[in-house]
Amino acid sequence: HRYIVVGIRKDLKLKFKIPKPPILNGFKNCKDAITEPPIKGDCPNHDFTKQSINVIKRLKHIKPGENAWTADLPENLKLNVKGAKLSMIYKRLDPEKPSYTITGSGGGGTHVYHWIENRALTNRERARLQTFPDDFIFHGSKESVRRQIGMAVPVDGVRYILEAILKTFAEVEYESIESNLKDL
């Protein structure tokens, strides 16, 4: 989950309202987010990670939307961990649904996996799911870039909030929704 707190000094006598989420033509599925338009070969942060043989073998048995516990894995490929049926471990994206949460933590099969190809997503593909433009360059090691992307708030999501803040200060009306929290 992402929580965003907007605070405005009381002496300004302005009231921020939560902007109504834009629901244009439904949602964008993760396949379209990653593939449309195609990522250029020389695009920054689009380096593929080498997968181990066991990871590739495991991924061959995991269908889109499944993870290491919900897939029908052969005994020799099952993980030796108890519980965690709702885990993100070795979870493949479902190409027809929005992406699940992109996280900045890592290791142990939590890299976000392609729906068809037996591999983790590149950092550029992860960045696209967070709605970063392809010309935005992340700096640092692959793991550092992965953390930056996972810790980010999706660009398109924060854009609506920033526009609402600007309209609040300009005293321009905008469509809003009621908060599900009590006034603090």
PLM features: residue spans?
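Flexible, glycine-/basic-rich loop-and-beta segments that form/coincide
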Residues: 1-52, 56
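C-terminal target-recognition/interaction regions appended to catalytic cores
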Residues: 46-184
